[in-house]
Amino acid sequence: MTDFEKTYQNYNPRQAALDEARALLTEAAKAAMADGTLPEAELPAFIVEIPADVKNGDIASNLAMAGARTWRKAPKMIADALIAHLPSIEGSVFSKVEVAGPGFINLFLSQSFWAGVVLGACANKEYGRTDHGKGAKYNVEFVSANPTGPMHMGNARGGALGDCLAAVLDWAGYDVTREFYINDAGNQIQKFGKSLAVRYLQQFCGEEAYPLPAECYQGGDIKVLAGEFAEIHGDAYVAPCKGMSEEELFASEAFETLKNALVDYALPKNIAALQRDLGKYRIDYDVWFHESTLHESGAVKAVVDKLLELGACYKAEDGAVMYRSAQYAAKYGTVNKKKTEDGTEEEAKDEVLVRANGIPTYFAADIAYYWDKRHRAENSADVAIYMLGADHHGYIGRMMAMCAAFGDEPGKNMQILIGQLVNVMKDGKPVRMSKRAGNVVTIDDLVSVVGVDAARYSLARSDYNQNFDIDLALLASHTNDNPVYYVQYAHARSKNVDRNAAAAGISYEGADLALLDTEADGEVLAALAQFPSVLATAADDRQPHKVARYLEELAATYHKWYNVERVVPMALTDPETRGDDEARKALEIAKNPEPARAAARLKLNDAVQQVIANGLDLLGVTAPEKM
C-alpha cells in the first residue's frame, strides 16, 4: 500500500468533518469564556449534524441555542461570539461559517474536502471500511435451518440479511464470525426419523397399512429420501416391523433401528444440500456447529452444573433440573407463559432443563451453545447475535434471562433479531413453486426463477422487522422500478463512461477536482461522503437493509448527474447556442467541459463506480460491467 493509499485507509469524510466541527466550536467556546465574552461555565451538550437542507450549510450546530441558559445570553449573541472566537479555518475542511435564524451555526465544507472524498473513493478499493468497531469480536448466527427439509423463504431472507449484516460489521471494524447451528439432535431429528421410517414402510406395504401421523413431516422430500433408502436396502427393515399396532410399532426396537438407519442416511444428505444451496446463494460460513457435539462432549451437563452452582437452577423432587424462569420473566419479558382456554396468560413457570429421566431439553443445549460461543478457545465472541425467524418471539425472554444468569449483559453480549414473514407474489397472488416440498417455496426455487442477484438484493433491502412481499414479475423486469436493476445499471453505466472516455483519450491526467462545482456534482459528492457513515450506522443499528437503500439513493443521484453532465465533450446544438449568456454558459459547462473538468468528472464517475461495487459486494450481489 502506498503512502497516498494509507492516507485514505479507514477514511470516513463525513465523520471527520463532524468531529472537526465539534472540535472547532468547543475551542471557540473555551476562548470566548477565557476572555470574558461569555461567562465561565461548563460547556453545554450540543448537536453537530448534517442539515436536511443544503442551504443551511454542510454541517449545522445548535451550540448557541443549547448554551442560552448556561451563558444567560440570546442565542444570536452567543453564535456571533463563538464565530468571532473560532480558530482560523484556513487549512481546515471548512471554507466559511455563518450564523442563521435564531442562532444556528452553519459550516460550509471546502473544495479540498470534497476533492478528498473523490480521491479517497478512487484510491482505496475498500472505501467505506472503517475501524469504528475497534476489533470487537462478533458472532453472527443466521439461517440455522433444521436439516430436516429444504430451506424456505424465511431462511432465504435471513440468509440475505444475515450475510449482509456480517459483511457490514466486518467493514465497520468488527472481527466477525459467520456461524450456522446444525440442529442434528433432539425432538426434530426424532420426528425426522419417524417420518422417514413410516414413508419407508409405505414403500412396501402401502399408506393404508402405515398412515403418516399428522405430527410428522409431510413434504415430498421425505418420500424421496425414504425411496432412495429403499432402493439401496430393499425391504430388509420391513419384516421386523410387521404385526404390531401403531403404538407398539413406534415403541419397538425394530422401529428405532429403522429410524436410526434412515437418519444416518438422510441427515448427511440434507446437511450437504443445505451447504450446497447456501453456497449457491453466495453465503460462506466460518463455522458449521453441530448441536450433537454439545451432548457428546459433555458441554450440556457442564453448563447445567454451572447454572446449579450459580443458583439459576434447582433440582425438583422428582430429580428434574428446573430453570428459575419465573423470577426472570418480569425483567426479560415472556419466558414461558401460555394462553389459557379463556385467552388469558398463565403466570410464568419454571422450566425443565433436564428431565427426571436424565434427558436434557433442547433449551439446555441452547444454553450450552451460548456458553460455547462466549468462551470457546478460538474466536470467542464479545457479542453473540442471533438472527431468528418470526416464530421465535417466545425465545427472547428465556435466552436473555439465561444470559443474565451467567453475569453477561442481555441486549449487549447477547442480541436477538427476529425476522418477520416473507411472501412470494406474482400478479398480486401468492406463488407455489416447489413440487418437492409441498407448499414450501425454497431458496433453490427462488434462485432458479430470478437469479441470485435479484433474490439476495430484494430480500436484503427490506427491514427485518417488517413483513415483506417479494414480487417475481418485478424482479425479472429490466426497468427502473426493479431496484436491483436500477442500482446495477448505474454501475454498468459508469463502466460505459470509462470506455467512452478511453476511446476519446480522456484520463485522470490534469484533473482539477475544484471544478466539480455544479449542483449535480455537489449532490453526487454529498452522497459519496455518506457511505462510510451509512455502513457504521447500519452496523450499530443492526439494519443491513440501509446499505441497499443508500445504494438506491446514490444510483438515483448518479443517473441524474449522468443525464445532465458529460465526461466526453459534446458540442452544443444550434438551438442551445442561441440562449442567453447564463444558460449557454451552463450548457457549455455541462456538455462541453474543458479537459481539466472532463478529467475531474471521470474521477467522480469512478468514485461512484467504486462505492456501488463495494455496496453491492456487501449485499452479495454482482456489479456488472455491461447491461
Predicted regions and their residues:
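Non-catalytic interaction-recognition regions
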Residues: 2-115, 123, 129-627
